[in-house]
């Protein structure tokens, strides 16, 4: 599959602005819901602006820490991989997708994303250059989260 299919899709600026406004309204009333936070994060990681993508990553990481639902955690990990790949942090992207594949070895969507990330790395001339060490510490926590949620 062409890496552009997943990694190059972008959020329409109007959708991005609407998601931000809805999220900010909920923040003004207190803690935003997980659904609202996820919708905002999903829109942000599709932005062309690297700072927006990073803001989406922060939201997804918070959701991953705070949400107990296993299916939701799976989605957060998947979209964290997408987000990191979009800002060319391929080591972290592969780390997240590998955690997901360790938990769900038959997950075709995750396998496709992994191939897309590798294709993007090749396209960017970075094959074999991803440094897993920096992401290993952050991902160790994810492994623990998935291990605990299996019990």
UniProtKB/Swiss-Prot annotation:
Involved in the fragmentation of the mitochondrial network. Involved in perinuclear clustering of the mitochondrial network. May act, redundantly with fis-1, downstream of mitochondrial fission, before the fission products participate in mitochondrial homeostasis, mitophagy, or apoptosis. Plays a role in apoptosis by promoting mitochondrial elimination and cell-death execution, acting downstream of caspase ced-3, and perhaps independently of dynamin GTPase drp-1, caspase ced-9 and apoptosis-inducing factor AIFM/wah-1. This is FIS1-related protein fis-2. Belongs to the FIS1 family. The chain crosses the membrane at residues 126-146. InterPro entries: Fis1 (IPR016543), Fis1_cytosol (IPR033745), Fis1_TPR_C (IPR028061), Fis1_TPR_N (IPR028058), TPR-like_helical_dom_sf (IPR011990). One of its GO terms (biological process) is peroxisome fission. GO terms for cellular component: mitochondrial outer membrane; mitochondrion; peroxisomal membrane. It is found in: Mitochondrion outer membrane; Peroxisome membrane; Mitochondrion. Its main location: mitochondrion. Pfam families: Fis1_TPR_C (PF14853), Fis1_TPR_N (PF14852). It is a single-pass membrane protein. Disruption phenotype: Mitochondrial connectivity appears normal and also normal in a fis-1 mutant background. Abnormal, but minor, affects on apoptosis, with fewer cell corpses and an increase in cell numbers in a caspase ced-3, ced-4, or dynamin GTPase drp-1 mutant background. Increases number of ectopic cells in a combined ced-3 and drp-1 mutant background. Increases number of ectopic cells in a combined ced-3; ced-9 mutant background, which increases further in a ced-3; ced-9; drp-1 mutant background. PANTHER family: MITOCHONDRIAL FISSION 1 PROTEIN, TETRATRICOPEPTIDE REPEAT PROTEIN 11 TPR REPEAT PROTEIN 11. GO terms for molecular function: lipid binding; molecular adaptor activity.
């Amino acid at each position: 599959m062409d890496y552009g299919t997943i990694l190059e899709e972008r959020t329409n600026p109007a959708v991005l602005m609407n998601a931000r406004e809805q999220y900010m309204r909920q923040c003004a009333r207190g803690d935003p819901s997980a659904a609202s936070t996820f919708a905002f994060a999903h829109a942000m990681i599709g932005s062309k602006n690297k700072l927006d993508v990073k803001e989406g990553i922060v939201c997804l990481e918070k959701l991953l820490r705070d949400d107990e639902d296993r299916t939701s955690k799976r989605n957060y990990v998947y979209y964290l991989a997408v987000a990191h790949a979009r800002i060319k942090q391929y080591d972290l992207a592969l780390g997240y997708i590998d955690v997901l594949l360790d938990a769900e070895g038959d997950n075709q969507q995750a396998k496709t994303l992994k191939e897309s990330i590798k294709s993007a790395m090749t396209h960017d001339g970075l094959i074999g250059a991803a440094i897993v060490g920096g992401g290993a510490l952050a991902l160790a926590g994810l492994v623990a989260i998935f291990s605990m949620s299996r019990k």
